[in-house]
Amino acid sequence: GIKNGLPLNDPDAHFDKEHPWRDLDPRFYADITYDGLQVIQNTAKFTSEQKDKQIQYANLYTGGNYRDVKNESRTGYLLHKFTPLVVNGFDEGFRDYGDALTIQVSWMRLSDIYLMYAEAVANGYGGPSAKADGCSLTAVDAVNKIRERAGVDDVASKYAGSLDGFMSELRRERAVELAYEGHRFNDLRRWLLLTEYPYTIKTSQEFDRVELDKEDPTQSRVSNFREEVIVTRNFSEKHYWLPLKVSDVNIYPELYQNPGW
């Protein structure tokens, strides 16, 4: 999304396809390595070929040397969340973490609690402006708490005024705030959207680099910015369930396997 709190596809967001990394939600920059970002600081060990290819920058444009689908990026982006930029073979920042980079992830974050509260209240207490008994926050307030911390504008009134509009923003908020923390599959199952378009596809960002701003890559200019489908997931109704162990099902004739399995 955009820093102003709107999704990219909202006309009022004014998403600029020539400068697609400008004025985005600050969490994008914290979570994602995008084209032109300097990911290697120490270039002293570079070979002549590495210097020529300028591999210290994430060359994620279409055809760039960070777009090898076998071991780099299929999507035009790389993961930055949980991974300090200096953790690479040239900067050797991983040495500060011992023999290997260890990631500590909480079982439950406060942001997740706010989002669960917002979803439950909006659906169970009459809408986005409702509060749960004994609580001071509305569903919208709870989401805005998270956005305030992240430096993003509040949920726009056109989304906060209806349950459908609010849920579209809440689903997006969970995707952004809890990105790469293992929630999305079960979120989509809970919302019964696992088998629905566009949640069944994965896309790549394809573009040509026109001008790289090495000082501030958010200002870099591109052309032919577009999305292409690279994966279509063949989920079906059975994936709203999980299979029971065959050994458990075989214990009692009355214990049936879950539908579709």
Predicted stretch roles:
Residues 127-134:
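Intrinsically disordered, low-complexity Ser/Thr- and acidic-rich flexible linkers and loops
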Residues 1, 97-107, 143, 147, ...:
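Long, intrinsically disordered, low-complexity segments
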Residues 34-40, 152, 176, 194:
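Short loop/turn segments at secondary-structure transitions that flank enzyme active sites
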Residues 123-127, 155:
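Short, flexible helix-adjacent loops and helix caps
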Residues 110, 117-119, 124:
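Structural register within alpha-helical repeat arrays
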Residues 7-110:
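Flexible, polar/acidic helix-loop-strand segments at domain edges
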